């Protein structure tokens, strides 16, 4: 199994290291446009092998030729939003980056599974799908896995229980448009509504929506990377080991939930072939309305990018 991570920043490097540490790849490529960064980080990771007991071949590179014949490619490359930059500016710049990255990936790998982490997530996943020409089941956005992990973490803090006993369902877009579905959120099988008052649940939902911003506020510079990197690796593990995990991911819908031709976060089965099944679960009307609203925002932004992405 050969896995490539595009972007050697905090998210990309964390993702690459966890893939190596969990022995999910025989060969791992960390690629970045900045000379020396992927080479240095790649070598540092490789030198942990004797301690971590893994033999993954790790290559740091600036050349897409080194990514040839990758089975999985993870795109973390992109710019953060800077002061004075409008959302439209960020969209255009990152769409250009993801377009170029995807074009280069496809020159060297015929049929990879592409996992997109770059923001705005759902829209960048659409860009990667359009440019790659791959079937929708092979282009996946990492969104709900991270959002659900944050929701679970906050519930565990509130109740003082193990995170392992908490299951959470978060659908929709990554960010303000996410839809944490309370009725499918449980603690050891017990509905969260039986354990916490509605106003406390509402506060946890709101904290989940602002989870990324909360970390940015603490850090002052930069954003989250341990939790996004770990969330990507949960997806990679299900694909590589063909575990058939049911995880919330941004995928291209074709009529499910009344949404068509739009990438949005819903529960899917992830296996060796990528998205092997999309689950259309029963939603309350309020949650369905929020999900469709989230999809509409994604669709509008994608239409704005049509001339950019070709």
Curated annotation (Swiss-Prot):
InterPro entries referenced in this protein's UniProt entry, alphabetically: L-lactate/malate_DH (IPR001557), Lactate/malate_DH_C (IPR022383), Lactate/malate_DH_N (IPR001236), Lactate_DH/Glyco_Ohase_4_C (IPR015955), Malate_DH_type3 (IPR011275), NAD(P)-bd_dom_sf (IPR036291)
Chain sites annotated for binding NAD(+): 7-12, 32, 94, 117-119
Catalyzed reactions per annotation: (S)-malate + NAD(+) = oxaloacetate + NADH + H(+)
Enzyme class: oxidoreductase
Keyword set includes Oxidoreductase: yes
Subunit structure: Homotetramer; arranged as a dimer of dimers.
Protein name per UniProt: Malate dehydrogenase
